[in-house]
Amino acid sequence: EQTADLKVNHIFKYTSIKEIFNEITGKSAEVLKGMVEKRQETQVILCYSGCGGVGKTTVAMGISAALTKNYKRVLYMNASHLQVFQQMLINHSPITTMDVYSRLANPGGNIYDDIKHVIRKEVFNYLPPFKASLLSLGLNYSVYKEIICSAKKSGDYDFIVVDTDVTFDEAKTELIGVADRVIVVTKQSMASVVATNILVSNINGVSKEKFV
């Protein structure tokens, strides 16, 4: 089966990060490669999937690394209710400054400026993990949208790569709306294809050209 209404790029599980980036930019020149060559403002790339375990975080970090190595200013941000992405980085430690969480609980239009001092860099810049789930911290999922929009407005980055979880709700549709491109990651299994088709069938009113 094929995923409905999407341009499908086949990427094997053990494909290198460089090959993944070249595959995406090569087959979707008008989508990502064009964005790299002709940037007018900060571009938001959202990595999404219909189910877990498909390698979405690997793809998101791979794109972040590849763009950085191509001399682009990149911010990687994990937008999950419970974050576990840090296991793929050298520094696993979460944000511990209570002032940051206080500001995230009541984000203003310049929330990025309020928290950018905690941003770290390994291969690429990234927002460190929160010390607990959004629920435990009393944070609304919409805080991610606020950070993205504020960081975009700052002009500090060429690309903001957002790695989101599989939850589909109103807040997630708002993230999709903010994104310039949405990469839907799947794998060659019946369960993954079915989940992707269900996801796509529930996304209405969004231009197909936004999706990779």
Label each residue range with its predicted role.
Residues 1-2, 14, 48-50, 79, ...:
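Structural motif
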Residues 1-44, 93-95, 102-112, 194, ...:
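Acidic-aromatic/histidine active-site loop/patch
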Residues 5-8, 71, 157, 179-180:
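Short, well-ordered alpha-helix to beta-strand connector turns
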Residues 11, 45, 75-77, 125-127, ...:
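Hydrophobic/aromatic beta-strand patches that form the interior of the parallel beta-sheet core
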Residues 41-81:
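Walker A/P-loop phosphate-binding motif and the immediately C-terminal alpha-helix
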Residues 70-126:
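Phosphate-binding loop that captures ATP/GTP phosphates
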Residues 107-119, 126-165:
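Cytosolic-facing regulatory segments adjacent to core modules
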